[in-house]
């Protein structure tokens, strides 16, 4: 079973990947936020900004989400760098 999700990229991640968002049909086995990050990082150079170990935050349907949070069909996943204030 495949599922389509909406992915949004913000700030420096948007610049690194060259787009602000996309709709993506996920391959089998990509069922969590962490698995999605790994899948996207495998696309190549600019996408390495999403690789594990990089300081990237994720939100699922506008709520903060860890790597082990499951993704469902029609979900919106946003990736962004940490925000600091001062």
Task: Label each region the model flagged.
Residues 1-85:
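Ubiquitin-like/PB1-type beta-grasp interaction modules and other compact soluble beta-rich domains
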């Amino acid at each position: 079973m495949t599922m389509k999700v909406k992915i949004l990229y913000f700030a420096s991640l948007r610049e690194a990947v060259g787009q602000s968002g996309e709709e993506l049909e996920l391959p089998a086995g990509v069922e969590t936020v962490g698995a999605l990050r790994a899948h996207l990082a495998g696309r190549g150079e600019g996408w390495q900004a999403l690789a594990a170990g990089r300081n990237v935050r994720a939100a699922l349907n506008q709520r903060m989400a860890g790597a082990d949070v499951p993704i469902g069909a029609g979900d919106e996943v946003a990736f962004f760098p940490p925000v600091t204030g001062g």
